[in-house]
Amino acid sequence: MSVNRILVINPGSTSTKIGVFDNERPVLEETIRHDVEQIGKYKRIIDQYEFRKETILEVLHSHGINISKLNAVCGRGGLLRPIEGGTYTVNDAMLEDLKNGFSGHHASNLGGILAYEIASGLNIPAFIVDPVVVDEMEPVARISGIAGMERKSIFHALNQKAVARKVAEQLNHKYEDLNLLVTHMGGGITVGAHKKGRVVDVNNGLNGEGPFSPERAGTVPVGQLVEMCFSGEYYRDEMIKKLVGQGGLVSLIGTNDAIKVEKMVEKGDPEATLIYKAMAYQVAKEIGGASAVLHGKIDAIVLTGGLAYSKILVDEIKERVDWIADVIVHPGEDELEALAEGALRVLREEEAPKEYVVREKETVARG
């Protein structure tokens, strides 16, 4: 089998994770920490791309990586327009939306740009894989009870789909032939109904839907939320933080550290025990609801993400849902590996690269 050498790039707010893979085998994985003062000089996140590019090239050189031997570069997908899952070739339309922050400004927008900037000089393809804006929801799943307020698909697409493919392989099937309920449990928690390779429904793990998590509130009593918003006690930004960043375990018990909470549970702390059980309860409840989306025809339930390392949490969830289907646990996440695998499927011609297309009437992002 021929060897495809792939450079993968995953930009974060103050760091850039890079990896070099020979097919599935990691040759190099490194987290480049950026000086906060250095990146603070740039008015916009997008203006950092030249600085980050040079830093990446310097690190590769220091490790003896000859970039002329690369076959492709793959970056983390950013806040683009809603698109179906898959591996996309970075094109002009995508670059424009990433640079303009069409669906928002985030460090992940640099992924496709950095991939293109490095790949174009080497005359090799640049890709992105399964960004958070992946939207494969069925029309019936979009409807909410208020006109003009559509449900949105924002979830851990990269890890959910990567793990779903691993589970399919484990079950000796293609991902596209299975019905899976995949739950990513990290700082946020999302439960996706994967129907024959498409995530036809999923809770919005960012903006207050689904189970509460270490730092997100999830679904809360809407009437009480409205009252709190108009109480005059909070600014808008404070309310947003209550939903994302200061919600969930942070609000309920004062920490987003699930390991710390688990130790409290093990010591018999009644409050920690109830709250941790409640989080598992809400995850199980979301999985149960998602099973109805797939008419109860589920090949497996998958638990992944950092919280899937928690035996207490996993056992609580299993106890409530293992009657639906077998529960398979794939703890942690590996975004670099997932990006490399997405590029590799295209290089091996196992799937065709997708094209990012902008429709003329599409002037604002849906999502």
Swiss-Prot record:
SUPFAM superfamilies (alphabetical):
Actin-like ATPase domain (SSF53067)
- A Pfam family that the UniProt record links to this protein: Acetate_kinase
Catalyzed reactions per annotation: butanoate + ATP = butanoyl phosphate + ADP
Q: Which spans of this chain does the record mark as coiled coil?
A: none
The region annotated as signal peptide is none
Report the enzyme's class at the first EC level: transferase
Which InterPro entries did the record assign? Aliphatic_acid_kin_short-chain, Aliphatic_acid_kinase_CS, ATPase_NBD, Butyrate_kin
Kindly list the biological process annotations in GO that this record carries: acetate metabolic process
Give the subcellular location: Cytoplasm
Q: Single GO cellular component annotation? A: cytoplasm
Where does it primarily localize?
Answer: cytoplasm
Q: Which GO terms describe its molecular function?
A: acetate kinase activity; ATP binding; butyrate kinase activity
Task: Spell out the Gene3D superfamilies in the cross-references.
Answer: 3.30.420.40
Report the EC number(s), separated by commas if there are several: 2.7.2.7
Highest taxon above the source species: Bacteria
Key words of the record: ATP-binding, Cytoplasm, Kinase, Nucleotide-binding, Transferase
Instruction: Give the family this protein belongs to, as stated in its UniProt record.
Output: Belongs to the acetokinase family.
Q: Which PANTHER family match?
A: ACETATE KINASE, BUTYRATE KINASE 2-RELATED
Q: What is the protein name for this chain?
A: Probable butyrate kinase
Q: Which organism is it from?
A: Bacillus cereus (strain G9842)
Organism placement in taxonomy: Bacteria, Bacillati, Bacillota, Bacilli, Bacillales
